[in-house]
């Protein structure tokens, strides 16, 4: 049986699932086994502690992807992308297709985060510059983002003074990784791995 439009509110250590939907209200379900498949979500500017003002125009790459592909809405025309993950590089190409100018892709690591294939097809083929060991030092703007200040980092990810550069833009897309949805796992008493953030499992993924 499938229950659509149903949200799980709680999972108890006794394997009881508390859920809610429009038709039945709050319901309680019980089973011998519960499969946790909540997935993950994108890191936001708060989770990477991005400094600077808080104007509009700062989005995750996945949000921008949904707007362009499904809702037909362009996030902006002059774009900087933080992070060289696959979604970020794919969105660099997609924004270019839609007429935007992608000024730069910044990556804090000294290496590419995504697939080499996407780097070639999404950045190199469209002459979109990639700067490794660079990050956003500051967001500039009031109501809407007007620019970002980029900065080079050393091997310990510490900013290097004197390497700052102002890059005008009206949109900043974040492609800085994913974090697991752990709220229900915690409520169910599942032990979490501090290294990866996900649940500790055995060889059978239990």
Question: Positions of the model-derived regions?
Answer:
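Residues forming the flavin
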Residues: 1-206
